Amino acid sequence: QTVKTGFDHLEEFGVNAVQLLPVFDADNNEFEPTYNWGYNPKNFNVVDGVYSTNPKNGRTRINEFRELVAAFANNANNTRIIMDVVYNHTSTAMNSNFQALVPYYYFRTLPGGGLSNGSGCGNEFKTEAPMASKFIVESLVHWATRYKIKGFRFDLMGLVDIDTMAKAKQALYNIDPDIVIYGEGWGGYGATTLPGDKMTNSANLYANLHNEKTPG
C-alpha cells in the first residue's frame, strides 16, 4: 500500500487546521539555506521570501502563498490556515521602518529613555499608540481578506494591549465570524511599561469573560 506523505498525508489524516510559524518577512538572508523561526519580524504585511521559489519577485511570493492557503481550504477537510503573528516586537527598533517613520512613537520606552524589553527581544511594539493599534488591526484584515487566513495565533499576546485586541477581534469577525483567535496569555520575559490592566493576558481575559457571563 502506498503511504501518503506531505500534503496528501495531512488530508488523509483528517487534519482540519494547520498553524504555521510566522511567515511574514523576517530579518534574514533569504538566499542562505539556514533555518529561521520567523520570530524576528521586519515587514508585517508581506510573505517572507524564504518560502518562495523566487524571493526577488514580490508577485511570486504573494501568488504562491495564496495558492498554498487555497489548496488547504479546498481539500476534503476544508483545512484552515492559522498564522502565528508577532506584533509584540520587531527584529530591531533603531533600524526599523517604524523608527524611520516617527522616531520612538512605535516603541515603548523607559523613563530614562531606553527601550522597554518585556518581549526579551530588545524592544516592544507600542500597540496602544493610536497609529500602531490601527496598523495591527489593518494588518490582520489584510491577511484575512487578501490571503483568506482563517485563524491567528498571537505570540506574547499579553504585550498587546487589550483595547487593540478587542478592535482586532471585531474587525476579523466582521469578515468571518468563524475566524479563530488565540495566543500566549502572558507578557514575556521581562518588565514591560504596559500597565497590567491593559495587557491581553490570561488574568484579564478570564476577568472579562467572567464579567460578560455575570448578570448586573
Feature locations, PLM:
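Conserved Walker B
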Residues: 85-90, 157
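Active-site-proximal helices and loops of the catalytic beta/alpha 8
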Residues: 22-32, 38-40, 45-48, 71-75, ...
